[in-house]
């Protein structure tokens, strides 16, 4: 029963556009009432109606140690007693920057912002300032936040609503954005043939906003070569995959080295944080050292920094966490695949570290066109059955799922039982 959530949603609709502060949360693509959450604990969410859910969304990725993680909460509460934000430099910013930079040979310096959108927007501005060029290349289905020049065939919520671009974005803002097809190097070559003014190519090396779709190694290698040949920077958008797929994010799965990297989600431990980093030569162009302006009132705020430090230090101290989480993710989707096969339901699955994805699709998914061939009507029915049974998957076919450390094999077995019940009801 979701009677209290239904009443809460109606009240929210009076004051908030669509009743939500991020469109996908409204459940428009899957139907039904979005549960209004009262609290989270470990692998669980509890709504205001008293229902418990095994949570595979984990706030869309940040909570690798689960909800209300004790160590993170203690660090946040201790810092909050000292102050929430100062608008000044603090030791904490340097500490978190050092922890991240030490892991990556291609990152000498990093700057913190308050969201993934800000991180990507700032990285692209820096790439343009560094190269003196205006154009950028992005891939259909990759989501890089909601800044105007990037809200073009953006996947995620835009794909869910059948609106791959957004009204309110002037054509002049997007004329410098060239679109390529994910895992299709020929489409990237055509972009470089069309423009000699390309500053950067930005890609989710593990796409998570058209469902989970990893970039193929050969494709990334060819992409690196093209960027080098044309003097363009290669940006890995790891807002989602950073510290989620592995300790080095997607870079733990490829030999390809990007020029710039954006981060978010996990590095904030559940607090609003984004970041972008590169080698010193590039970052030197950023103000106040260089001419490329970027700023933020709450950037590097101490509460977010201690939350991030709590998470990143534990991950660095015990990187075997990723092996455990990957094994659990494989157990989940492997079991799901067997159940789906037994019912004759087409299903494609994939895993990268603690990230997983599944498509109700006849064929393997390698790009956005493939993803859009998935059975969205079946997904909606499946999602409704899972919510009824206390399983909280992302409310869109075009989103990745996440495993947290408290989500153990017992809970995965429980999930598989509910999946079997749900598919039996639908089929």
Swiss-Prot record:
One Pfam entry name: Aminotran_3
Q: Which molecular-function annotations from GO does this UniProt entry contain?
A: glutamate-1-semialdehyde 2,1-aminomutase activity; pyridoxal phosphate binding; transaminase activity
Q: What class of enzyme is it?
A: isomerase
Disulfide bond positions: none
* Gene3D superfamilies, A to Z: Aspartate Aminotransferase, domain 1 (3.90.1150.10), Type I PLP-dependent aspartate aminotransferase-like (Major domain) (3.40.640.10)
Name where it's found: Cytoplasm
**Reactions mediated catalytically:** (S)-4-amino-5-oxopentanoate = 5-aminolevulinate
Name the chain's protein: Glutamate-1-semialdehyde 2,1-aminomutase
The family line of this record is: Belongs to the class-III pyridoxal-phosphate-dependent aminotransferase family. HemL subfamily.
Gene Ontology BP terms: protoporphyrinogen IX biosynthetic process
Organism of derivation? Nitratiruptor sp. (strain SB155-2)
What cofactors does the UniProt entry give for this protein? pyridoxal 5'-phosphate
Q: Report the pathway entry.
A: Porphyrin-containing compound metabolism; protoporphyrin-IX biosynthesis; 5-aminolevulinate from L-glutamyl-tRNA(Glu): step 2/2
Record carries keyword Cytoplasm: yes
Q: What is its main location?
A: cytoplasm
Note the InterPro entries from the entry: 4pyrrol_synth_GluAld_NH2Trfase (IPR004639), Aminotrans_3 (IPR005814), Aminotrans_3_PPA_site (IPR049704), PyrdxlP-dep_Trfase (IPR015424), PyrdxlP-dep_Trfase_major (IPR015421), PyrdxlP-dep_Trfase_small (IPR015422)
Kindly indicate whether the keyword Ribosomal protein belongs to this entry.
no
Alphabetical keyword list: Cytoplasm, Isomerase, Porphyrin biosynthesis, Pyridoxal phosphate
The Gene Ontology CC terms held by the record are:
cytoplasm
EC nos = 5.4.3.8
According to the UniProt record, list the residues that bear N6-(pyridoxal phosphate)lysine.
265
Q: How does it assemble?
A: Homodimer.
According to the record, the segments passing through the membrane are none
């Amino acid at each position: 029963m979701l009677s209290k959530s239904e009443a809460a949603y109606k009240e929210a609709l009076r004051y908030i556009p669509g009743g939500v502060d991020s469109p996908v949360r409204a459940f428009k693509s899957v139907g039904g009432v979005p549960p209004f959450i009262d609290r989270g604990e470990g692998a669980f969410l509890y709504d205001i109606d008293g229902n418990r859910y095994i949570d595979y969304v984990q706030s869309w990725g940040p909570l690798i140690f689960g909800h209300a993680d004790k160590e993170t909460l203690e660090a946040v509460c201790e810092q909050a007693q000292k102050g929430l934000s100062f608008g000044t430099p603090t030791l904490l910013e340097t500490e978190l920057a050092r922890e991240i930079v030490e892991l990556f040979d291609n990152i000498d310096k990093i700057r913190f912002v308050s969201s993934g959108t800000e991180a990507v927007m700032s990285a692209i501005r820096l790439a343009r300032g560094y190269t003196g060029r205006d154009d950028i290349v992005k891939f259909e289905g990759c989501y890089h936040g909601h800044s105007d020049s990037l809200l073009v065939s953006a996947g995620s919520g835009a794909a869910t609503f059948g609106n791959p671009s957004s009204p309110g974005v002037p054509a002049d803002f997007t004329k410098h954005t060239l679109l390529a097809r994910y895992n299709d190097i020929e489409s990237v070559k055509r972009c470089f043939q069309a423009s000699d003014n390309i500053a950067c190519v930005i890609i989710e090396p593990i796409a998570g906003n058209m469902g989970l779709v990893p970039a193929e190694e050969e494709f990334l290698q060819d992409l690196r070569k093209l960027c080098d040949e044309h003097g363009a920077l290669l940006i890995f958008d790891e807002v989602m995959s950073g510290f989620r797929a592995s300790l080095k994010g997607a870079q733990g799965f490829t030999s390809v080295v990007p020029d710039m990297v954006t981060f978010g989600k996990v590095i904030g431990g559940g607090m609003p944080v984004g970041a972008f980093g590169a080698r010193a030569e590039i970052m030197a162009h950023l103000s106040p050292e260089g001419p490329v302006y970027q700023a933020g009132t709450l950037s590097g705020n101490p509460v977010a920094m201690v939350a991030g430090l709590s998470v990143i230090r534990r991950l660095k101290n015990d990187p075997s966490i990723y092996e455990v989480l990957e094994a659990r993710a494989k157990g989940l989707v492997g079991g799901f695949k067997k159940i789906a096969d037994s019912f004759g339901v087409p299903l494609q699955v994939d895993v990268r570290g603690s990230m997983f994805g599944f498509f109700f699709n006849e064929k393997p998914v390698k790009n956005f066109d493939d993803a859009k061939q998935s059975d969205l009507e079946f997904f909606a029915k499946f999602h409704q059955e899972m919510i009824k049974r206390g399983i909280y998957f992302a409310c869109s076919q075009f989103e990745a799922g996440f495993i947290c450390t408290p989500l153990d094999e017992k809970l995965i077995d429980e999930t598989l039982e509910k999946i079997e019940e749900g598919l039996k009801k639908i089929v």
